[in-house]
Amino acid sequence: LKTYRGVPLVKILAGIRRCGKSTILDMLQDDLVKSGIPADHIISMRYTSEDFDDGMTDKDMYNGIKNLMADDGRYYLLLDEVQEIDGWEKAVNSLLENANTDIYVTGSNSKLMSSEISTYLTGRYISIPVYTLSFSEYLEFKKSDSRSPKELLNEYLRLGGFPLVAFGNFD
């Protein structure tokens, strides 16, 4: 993501559920703060939260975010599970055009990649696929595990490369 920081495109992190997209946004937020971005210029929204109404519209989304922007400075928008908002593409496009923003969104593959993206965001986004852990990444998570690489490979093949699985012990 660092490669695309400040690039005037919507960065869309897409992948299957539980593959680590939200964690990547959390890590990005930490990196932004460490690099000197004021915390009040980082707007993080998780649209699966109970804080949002089921019937939230693109206008509600747009106005809610705009109301958090207190000045003309650059704002970093970290929008998690945006596909939960009908018409999110319009809101994000308007924020890209009408505000000083660097926008990152996540969502699940099936709902996120609709035809509306091509309508509202053509040429204005980059899709960044997020996958489950590779075996070498899985080994990195398990480096304190005393089992042999072969045993860990069997576990990886049996349970998959989801980060939550890599943190657990499923013997």
Model-flagged regions — what are they?
Residues 1-171:
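Phosphate-binding site recognition
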